[in-house]
Amino acid sequence: MKLNIGINVFDAALNRLQELYEQDHTIVISQSGGKDSTVCMELAIMAADAAGKLPINVIHRDEEILFPNTYEYLDRVANRPEVNMHHVWAGQPVINVFNRSDPYWWIFDEQIPREEWVRQPPDYAYKIDEMNINALVTRDRFPTPEDKEIYACIGLRVQESPNRRMGLFSSKGHITKPNDRGVKYVRPIYDWTDGDVWKAIENFKWDYNHAYDVMVKHGRSKNQLRIAPLTMTQAGIKDLQLAQKAWPQWFDTVTHR
């Protein structure tokens, strides 16, 4: 059951983050290049600015293959003075559900010529050994005093699936228990709708991934806009079909890869 707590979702999300910054905890924004993590990042910049804690920590694990405009957007993020960007790559295997004979491919596979990669990691990116995505945010990578918490901020929203709603309920709030590395996850926009996300981006004139504009141009509705790896589930076929029309040269490069 939803409860009206007498505050709008924007102010509630901002308060959730500002409280953590004011307590001098370490907060790391997981930035995928998508709209939800973009909103989390912009809210974190506002909260950290109010608390005198700029720049904010942002991390992105490179997936090599995401829609065009995604990494151009992330380059702009990395160049912002309010952001301490950690752009990492791990060479992790990725499921390819469309190829039964060769069901995995590797991000920036060092066993093939670099020229065969869809794109190159940016100069400011660095390689990490940990392939487990839950190992991105650690106290070693983001030094944190022993008496303070470290949080990974993610753009989870319960509107997107019943499983996410149940996960939020089971953790009894927008902050999880610490994982095996002592990191808690904070989900400041869990109660936002798609409309809330786009309203904030429009009202505050925030920069965003312009791949979304291309998706809309090709008939995608607001609740169908997603930035995600393309080969991990059968749902990716619709994204590949869109890419074939929207970015034919890029699609050919991905197909060859």
How should these model regions be labeled?
Residues 1-30, 35-257:
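Nucleotide-activated chemistry modules centered on ATP-dependent adenylation/adenylyltransferase
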